[in-house]
Amino acid sequence: MENEVIEKNFQIARLAEIAPTPCPCGQSRRAFMNEENSVASMHLVEIREDSELHYHKVMTELYYVLEGEGHIELDGQIHPLSVGTAVLIKPGCRHRAVGNNLKILNVPVPKFNPADEYPA
């Protein structure tokens, strides 16, 4: 199977097989980024220790911690992250996740748009 299947009524992605893309928090494997989809995308993100504070004007992001531990900075407040933690980040919230061996699932709504990523 290819790393993404796109059909009229469904799509399937193998996140581990998608090439990583640099992002403010580390490396991201982005699924459902095709033209046929505008609802949301799904990203498997490996978080770095030196992640960059940023924000979005349009996107809401949902984070779910899959592996590791670390913390997330949300508008200047630090909150711990561990396996099973979920975070909802609204537009305008300046944020960054920080960790070592920290892996999250990120669901941007609507679909991720690089033009909606701003340094804080």
Task: Map each language-model feature to its residues.
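A short, N-terminal "cap"/entry segment at the start of jelly-roll beta-barrel domains
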Residues: M1-A40, A120
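Short acidic-glycine-tyrosine-enriched beta hairpin
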Residues: G76-G92
